């Protein structure tokens, strides 16, 4: 992906483009560098550019994530490692119609992603997701609080 096409020619994007190019071509014969991989940079960029709100209610947690231009079938909601909520999707560029060319392209295309570590009381078996007007709402129900243990009485015997 060339950031210059999108009108992004800042030094930050130039460096990012250079890092991605290095990762794709293996940076020549020097395999000892510690540059991040292209997929890591892409995921980090997607996470930084995907705004989200997290709310806590008495019985649930609600994650609201902007997913503009995506249909519900284009969005993936997963739980990994029992407590990591992963939300991702990808907005593809609209196909150009014959005779039309972009003069300016400002709407975001590419990967949208967020990861959240769920609290211990999150019920990962009770998760629902609804996408409406470009906003995804993921509701994670809370587990009921553990019942307090009742004291156990031990009978003392006389020896």
Swiss-Prot record:
Q: Does the keyword rRNA processing apply?
A: no
A biological-process GO annotation: protein folding
Where would one find coiled-coil regions in this protein?
none
Protein keywords: Cytoplasm, Stress response
> InterPro entries, alphabetically?
A-crystallin/Hsp20_dom (IPR002068), HSP20-like_chaperone (IPR008978), Small_HSP (IPR031107)
Q: Which domain of life is it from?
A: Eukaryota
A Gene Ontology molecular function term of the record = unfolded protein binding
What subcellular compartments does it reside in?
A: Cytoplasm
Give start and end of each sHSP domain: 43-157
**Protein name, UniProt field:** 17.9 kDa class II heat shock protein
